[in-house]
Amino acid sequence: ALGSEIVKELRENLDWPYSEFEIPNEIYADWDASDIGQKYEDDWNEKVQTLKSENPEKAELLERLLNEKLPEKFDSNFSVFLEEILKHNEPIATRKASQKVLEFLKKNLPELIGGSADLSGSNNTNTSVSNPITSSQNGNYIYYGVREFGMNAIMNGISLHGGLIPYAGTFLVFMDYGRNAVRMAALMGIKVIFVYSHDSVALGEDGPTHQPIEHLTTLRSTPNMQTWRAASLLETAVAWKLSLIHISEPTRRTT
């Protein structure tokens, strides 16, 4: 600590006559951005009103997305879908089961933005209706490259923006590379779905470097995070549904 005498001398040298924790009105005025913010808000409200007039259907969709609500008939449609796929409940890897569920979800939820850290073919996070986002075209799927932390942090940003639900995958053992962003998602209580495949200690041909041991314990002990480890097509489908309807916590799924 500087000490009271040094602080007093510093105040005199800086010509700072204000008391402790006092902020002068001039500084408040210089930092006040309410006028600029009001302009942005007015512009946004005008665009929303224009959209409501010109395209009520899109305006209704926008309102639903920004309010983080699922479609009105989502529950009933999902139940029908579930009954149908369970008629052919063959034993398959849960990452493939996850892809089956995603095929339905992506066709019914335009707010889903998928991706993977260079493992789309292994995680099965892409679907027949996945359109890659590039610098020149819109889409609903991001090829993040080999950068797990960047991927997770970007998903956090997408979620914080609102209106979209991000999900993306990598191998469970690579969770460590993006761990801080996963923890931040839990800390902020935002809606992000982390998909981790190849979660068995004995799975894969790459040996112990790709076989997770402590990772499940780490994620399960993270406060404010749901962890689903599905073991069948039914459990995978239910895990996806509960991940989507839960608003205030990120979800981490293994497949």
Question: What kind of region is each of these model predictions?
Answer:
Residues 113, 120-216, 238:
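Thiamine diphosphate
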